[in-house]
């Protein structure tokens, strides 16, 4: 069995087709098909089943996929350690993140990391909180940004307590002029985030045992701001999500203050490959500087 066969199997499983896997690996379709067939022959059972909707893993394929991913990670770690002994810094770091981190932090993190380690490749996958946690657990990414509480089995480093704010259309007046209380949400139409994207709002509602009415849901931060701007309701948004968006909305803090705790997660910090470990340290240092006001930017109306 070869590493090439492992790479082919994982690429097909993740991309859902032989053609997409071939494109990703820069191989011909016939080379991908041959590598898969040889792998299946050595194993003695089929890994994939082709049907009209595409390709799906067999039970055997599902069972082997996590182990094959781990083998590839171990090989990458070995090559990085060998490169480090030669005085080089190389490898690949895969990061999972939700939208506001992807917009507010990651561009600066990647740029500054590239200045330090120009030979390390960084790839980004964006999704909801649960998506990112699942990618970490399945070894599809090395590091991921999620919020507390974290799923069992993840190693997390707290990064930042991100204040939660209420955004409202112009002309909106809370009971006090300076802030809004969580129970007041029940008095208004609330624009909610889509499933897996609004856990912080769900946590506030559950914490205060509040039931709200909602006529709109959206995943994209900009879409939520636009819906609120149009006068269709108010919404709860993290401060980080508002830094890079402008809109004709009012922003009110909660009293008592509400927040989400953003953490950097991995399967195990100790077992991270050198490149991923360097990125982990870089992210922690960056966010510490950012939260102290060294690199904040953006504004909102």
Describe each PLM feature range.
Residues 174, 188-209, 272-280, 287-293:
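Secondary-structure junction motif
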Residues 11-28:
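Short helix-boundary/capping micro-motifs
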Residues 42-43, 64-86:
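Alpha-helical linker/hinge and terminal dimerization helices associated
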Residues 90-152, 218:
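Central regulatory/effector-binding core of bacterial HTH transcription factors
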Residues 40-59:
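A short LG(V/I)-centered, amphipathic sequence patch enriched
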Residues 153-158, 162, 223-271:
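Beta-alpha-beta core module
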Residues 154-190:
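Flexible hinge/capping segments at coil-to-helix
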Residues 105, 251-295, 300:
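A late-sequence structural motif
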